[in-house]
Amino acid sequence: YDYGFKQEGLDKKNKIIFVHGSSRRNKEYPLDYWKKLADHLNDFNLDICVPVHGENQLNFFKEINKINSRAFKLETENFHKIKEEFDKCSFFIGVDTGLTHICAGLGLSGIFLFGPTDPSKVGPVFDHQRVIKKSEMTEINPSLIIKMLKEESFE
């Protein structure tokens, strides 16, 4: 399969971003699914950048870090620090939220996870960014994301 990701893959920076927080619950991807992704990434020389703002996102980070000790938190109070860290990353997996759109705007390769939102209105515009769209976020099986990650040279 050709998902159109950048050909240089992740070898240049070895960091991936998990953008998980959203202003609406129905746009959030289930924690257990994120854990499956983090567990899959345990076998690779990758750091997982987890943006954190508030207690819920801090708890999310702690759960991911239990599964994959390479996960690190990025405080999101300072936009310049966010951009500086995102510039060190090669790839993102994110729900429909502002930080995911920032990743996309910075030109990172990645996967947008869409539930109730219409990606044709707010989705990515670059060929190296892909969308998984289901009516409910719980319908996005982590195995589909893992399949796409394999195309990004994770295996």
Task: Briefly describe each language-model feature range.
Residues 1-27, 31:
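Mid-sequence helix-capping/hinge segment at a functional interface
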Residues 8-13, 43, 147-155:
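Short, Lys/Arg-enriched, disordered terminal segments
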Residues 26-27, 57, 138:
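Alpha-helix N-cap/loop-to-helix initiation residues
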Residues 33-111, 115-119:
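Donor-binding and catalytic core of enzymes assembling or modifying cell-surface/extracellular glycoconjugates
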Residues 101-155:
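Nucleotide-sugar donor-binding patch of glycosyltransferase catalytic domains
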